[in-house]
């Protein structure tokens, strides 16, 4: 929820109030007699709803028009409701102004003068992700629509009963429609409520620090960055996500909030993906990322963070593919780096080395247990015949049976859905990313040279010493980047200070399983570094 003037809310209120002011002198004959019979409970709901909806429409800037997205359709439907509402009034003012004229259906919509604005403001709440408006519209609807349904029945009388078979069919159809609406809007209300609660909590939690989203001009385009910390004087950690092309910045706060009391975390959607991708696409920048451009953009971002927070150096934290970017960067620019935290270090993806490594271990375990290895060998052969990201997925699924994680995820899908940072572009990119599993090659193409470069990466051939302290964190059940390979590499390198922390029972993303343990280990290492 973002406080600020809403011109959309003002327009909606004008469309609501103007015809009502005109109506005050053009009420249906005998209307006041019906008012005396209004249910006091429904009237109370109506007044409370009006009290909530009217100011809320004006003071939340989220209702204003953003860029064109899925949510724009929700705003459009809301506007259409208000337009039909105006047509309703025109029809009424041109009629004889009887109770029946006032309560005549429009386009099959019952009590349109009451239901249309309620639906419009409810949808405005969905569009703006604002639970205050949503609840206000629901309360208003209970009272306002309830009152006017009673008036309509008084004006028109009860409808004659339809035949039993017709009533049954219509009843079933209504039940199905109502159930669908409850499920769909129930989901949105749940997500928006959780999101709003988290937004308010974090506004208070970080009021003395920073909780900001922005686009930073980098060497090769704009980069989306989220800055989170409780004191802007704290050292800075730049987080490099995995992939390539797999940002999850909307969820990283769940993993790294434990660092924000001592560090400011900069979470970046790397060049060519996520919000950074959509921002540059909108500006006509269709440049595909390359290993060189990634490093240039990291350097630009590091310089921005150093300048903004008055720091000589920053900590680089990388996960999975981010450890490739981080290893390269700290080797090229040690003068700008305090330390390197590597989570799930990529040692060698050359010729998919880690996948072969994981397969051999799974095959050995399967044979030792006397399991049928036919399917395992089949998917491995398919992978070897055409090694790529798509054919890798069935292989990982088959080998995972023998590489079970014993530590559960610390977060649920509900936590992700209720993230205060989840945006439309995050959902768009995630769907685009997962379309790869269905054989869509567009995602791979969007990553330019990065995937090909990763497939030729072997850190043993590049870096045997570092000029900055380095810490390697791996899950003991990580077979995407096997911890034993990381340990062998760790033991072979030289650095001013080095440490390795194996998280027992965790997989490739230990920060999602034991975030508190991981953050404590990181803090301890950085203090000693």
Residue ranges and their predicted role:
Residues 247-256:
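The serine-hydrolase catalytic nucleophile loop
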Residues 260-279:
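Conserved alpha/beta-hydrolase
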Residues 293-313:
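Conserved acidic catalytic loop of the alpha/beta-hydrolase fold
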Residues 311-354:
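Conserved hydrolase catalytic core segment
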Residues 337-385:
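A catalytic-pocket lid/entrance helix-loop region that shapes and gates access to the active site
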Residues 366-461, 468:
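Alpha/beta-hydrolase
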Residues 466, 472-474, 478:
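Short beta-strand/loop motif that positions the catalytic acidic residue
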Residues 506-515:
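Catalytic histidine-centered segment of alpha/beta-hydrolase-like enzymes
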């Amino acid at each position: 929820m973002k406080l600020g003037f809403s011109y959309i809310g003002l327009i909606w209120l004008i469309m609501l109030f103007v015809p009502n002011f005109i109506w005050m002198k053009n009420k249906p004959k005998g209307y006041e007699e019906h008012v005396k019979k209004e249910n006091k409970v429904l009237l109370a709901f109506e007044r409370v709803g009006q009290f909530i909806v009217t100011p809320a429409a004006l003071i939340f800037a989220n209702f204003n028009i953003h860029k064109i997205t899925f949510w724009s359709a929700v705003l459009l439907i809301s506007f259409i409701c208000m337009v039909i509402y105006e047509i309703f009034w025109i029809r009424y003012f041109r009629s004889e102004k009887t109770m029946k004229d006032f309560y005549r259906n429009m386009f099959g919509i019952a009590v349109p003068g009451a239901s249309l604005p309620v639906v419009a403001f409810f949808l405005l709440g969905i569009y703006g992700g604002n639970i205050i408006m949503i609840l206000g519209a629901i309360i208003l609807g209970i009272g306002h629509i309830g009152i006017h349904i009673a008036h309509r029945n008084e004006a028109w009388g009860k409808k004659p009963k339809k035949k039993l078979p017709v009533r049954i069919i219509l009843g079933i159809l209504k039940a199905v429609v109502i159930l669908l609406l409850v499920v769909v809007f129930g989901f949105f209300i749940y997500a928006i409520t959780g999101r709003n609660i988290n937004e308010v909590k974090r506004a208070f939690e970080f009021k003395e620090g920073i909780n900001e989203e922005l686009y930073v001009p980098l060497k090769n385009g704009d980069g989306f960055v989220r800055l989170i910390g409780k004191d802007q004087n704290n050292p800075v950690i730049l987080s490099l996500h995995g992939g390539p092309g797999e940002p999850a910045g909307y969820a990283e706060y769940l993993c790294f909030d434990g660092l924000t009391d001592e560090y400011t975390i900069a979470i970046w959607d790397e060049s060519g993906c996520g919000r950074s991708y959509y921002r540059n696409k909108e500006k006509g920048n269709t440049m595909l990322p390359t290993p060189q451009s990634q490093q240039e953009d990291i350097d630009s971002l590091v310089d921005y963070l150093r300048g903004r927070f008055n720091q000589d150096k920053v900590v680089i934290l990388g996960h999975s593919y981010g450890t490739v970017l981080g290893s390269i960067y700290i080797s090229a620019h040690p003068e700008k780096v305090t330390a390197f935290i590597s989570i799930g270090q990529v040692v060698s993806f050359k010729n998919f080395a880690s996948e072969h490594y994981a397969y051999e271990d799974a095959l050995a375990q399967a044979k030792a247990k006397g399991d049928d290895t036919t399917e395992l060998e089949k998917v491995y052969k398919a992978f070897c015949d055409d090694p790529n990201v798509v054919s890798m997925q069935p292989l990982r699924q088959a080998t995972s049976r023998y590489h079970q994680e014993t530590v559960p995820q610390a977060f649920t899908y509900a936590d992700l859905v209720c993230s205060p940072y989840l945006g439309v572009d995050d959902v768009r990119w995630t769907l685009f990313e997962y379309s790869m599993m269905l054989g869509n090659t567009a995602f791979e193409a969007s990553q330019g040279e990065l995937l090909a470069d990763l497939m030729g990466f072997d850190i043993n051939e590049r870096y045997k010493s570092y000029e900055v302290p380095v810490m390697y964190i791996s899950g003991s059940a990580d077979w995407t980047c096997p911890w034993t390979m990381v340990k062998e590499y760790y033991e072979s390198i030289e650095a001013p200070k080095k440490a390795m922390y194996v998280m027992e029972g965790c997989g490739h993303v230990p920060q999602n399983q034991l975030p508190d343990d991981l953050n404590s280990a990181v803090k301890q290492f950085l203090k000693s570094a």
